[in-house]
């Protein structure tokens, strides 16, 4: 029996099984089997010549972040790439115009953001149809995904693309599950949860059965939140990508205001017309917000800060002085003594800080060496 047939068999059995407390154990085992078969299906061709990425797909990462345009053929991805970056991608009114991966660069707020126009996705991509597998594989390397939808048929396309990406282990606008999973040499499967958690979807028997399906017989599993069977399987698989996503509703000039108001309820969405250049500024602002980039200006001793060439790094807890130094050159941190920081992250201007200080957008930093 082929993998595709095995997957179909498991999916059929899941469809026949009623979802209730009595069947949750059985469904958990079926979901684990399904995840295993799908992984094998996706990884299978990588051992042979069929796994070749194809012309234009081996695009080296450039700039401060990478953004991928994913959508069905002829939804306006190539036009959007041209309008945002000035990079020319062949545009026509028929499907499958783009056959390779076209890179461009957005220069925005001092940052260089690589934008990839990927070939149009088709249903069944996760199962290897068309070039969808290659498209989604590149999507896994992106810091942000823009799903471009045609305003005339947005919800149908949205559902299909989400299913294809999910089948390839890409989780959109989600955080990694709060589960600690650690294999060990002996002691069996130990399942526990933190005191503030009352698990309703995972119990010890289900966890043990799923682990047995993966031939894992010794492990510690700690729930730090109320997680689902699917989330536990994601943790065991260990190859899931959690990436922010913006739904770009293109060709809004072809629908009425009333229809646009209805579509406004879609979360994480921006309406545009790439052809008429409507609302592209709002899209750029949203891209900047979702990438969580910050600009840090360098200040040589005795000189004014360099406002023309900011150092662009990811914001949040990762945006430490050490990250800032390593972004410039990894030798700086070895000679680091302290930093003087001006800006919203400083308690007073300037503040003397160590390498663990977390920076904010548009901070000014002067490095003092040993």
Curated annotation (Swiss-Prot):
Keyword Acetylation applies: no
Residues reported in the UniProt entry to bind GTP: 71-78, 117-121, 250-253
Keyword Ribosomal protein: no
Entry's Gene Ontology molecular function annotations: GTP binding; GTPase activity
Pfam families (alphabetical): MMR_HSR1, MMR_HSR1_Xtn, TGS
GO cellular component, one term: cytoplasm
Biological-process GO terms, alphabetical: cytoplasmic translation
Residue ranges constituting the TGS domain according to the UniProt record: 292-369
Domain OBG-type G, first and last residues per copy: 65-292
Keywords per UniProt: GTP-binding, Nucleotide-binding
Top-level taxonomic group: Eukaryota
Family statement: Belongs to the TRAFAC class OBG-HflX-like GTPase superfamily. OBG GTPase family.
NCBIfam families, alphabetized: small_GTP (TIGR00231)
Protein name: Developmentally-regulated GTP-binding protein 1 homolog
